[in-house]
Amino acid sequence: MFTGSIVALITPMDSKGSIDRMGLKKLVDYHVDNGTSAIVSVGTTGEMSGLTHSEHVDVVMWTIEFSDGRLPVIAGTGSNSTSEAILLTNQFNDSAVSACLSVTPYYNRPSQEGLFQHFRAIAESTNLPQILYNVPIRTGCDLLPITVGRLSTIKNIVGIKEATGNLNRVNQLKRLVNEDFILLSGDDISAVDFMRLGGHGVISVTANVAPKDMSTLCSFVQKNDFKSAYDINNRLIPVHQSLFFDSNPIPVKWACKELGLISYDTLRLPMTSISKEHSVLIRKALEDADLL
């Protein structure tokens, strides 16, 4: 089961926008050393929309190589085309990928029946465990709990990253899925509350800059020490907030550069560099949280 602090890992690039392979190794080692429980490779934070198909596959495979069995690797494999999602998922059938994270189709705005058939078709094309990913603010469609319940009956659909920030979803989902179905928060600010209600962990943007804190926070939740978990979360709230002052991953890549975790905060168009105003606010949040 995937639990605890799972980092939604950034994809490091050099000054010209090429993938920084050794920079990726440094990040993987950093997360191994700081208690992260698993890595999501090439999800939203990893700029899945900005990489070519071959780059996407390369980054996931390099992440597996550098992890070397020390951390599970979850591959981002979603697409708004069902056939493309199947193609990308099947690239990892013979790899050491632990699971795939499949985002709801963006732009198309499918019906709930369309979403059901989309994810069923992907799951039936592979033996790899599938984690659903619901993030309506980015995709324009909402995978409702009733549809998740239907999908949870498919053997290799094993969980969901629920990123609405709507805590009512936890109880709704728990009533509709089996007890082994994995519930992961995709919203750092509300993650402690999500887990307190029965969630199993968080796929975290903040873990890029505060992996030890996020890991410790999750450990406290697992021990039912919610006071200690909230103490950490309250210190990190300005960081959680600041990492979304601009579209993800613009702020978190800048923050990682400031922390010396990557050499450049290079992004690919249409993403552009962070504004001076926001960089000042992010720096203050990092300093106030004793991260910088």
Swiss-Prot record:
The lineage of its organism: Bacteria, Pseudomonadati, Pseudomonadota, Gammaproteobacteria, Enterobacterales. The record marks T44, Y107 as: Part of a proton relay during catalysis. Its main location: cytoplasm. Homotetramer; dimer of dimers. The gene is dapA. Belongs to the DapA family. Keywords: Amino-acid biosynthesis, Cytoplasm, Diaminopimelate biosynthesis, Lyase, Lysine biosynthesis, Schiff base. GO terms for molecular function: 4-hydroxy-tetrahydrodipicolinate synthase activity. This is 4-hydroxy-tetrahydrodipicolinate synthase. It comes from Blochmanniella floridana. It catalyses: L-aspartate 4-semialdehyde + pyruvate = (2S,4S)-4-hydroxy-2,3,4,5-tetrahydrodipicolinate + H2O + H(+). Catalyzes the condensation of (S)-aspartate-beta-semialdehyde [(S)-ASA] and pyruvate to 4-hydroxy-tetrahydrodipicolinate (HTPA).
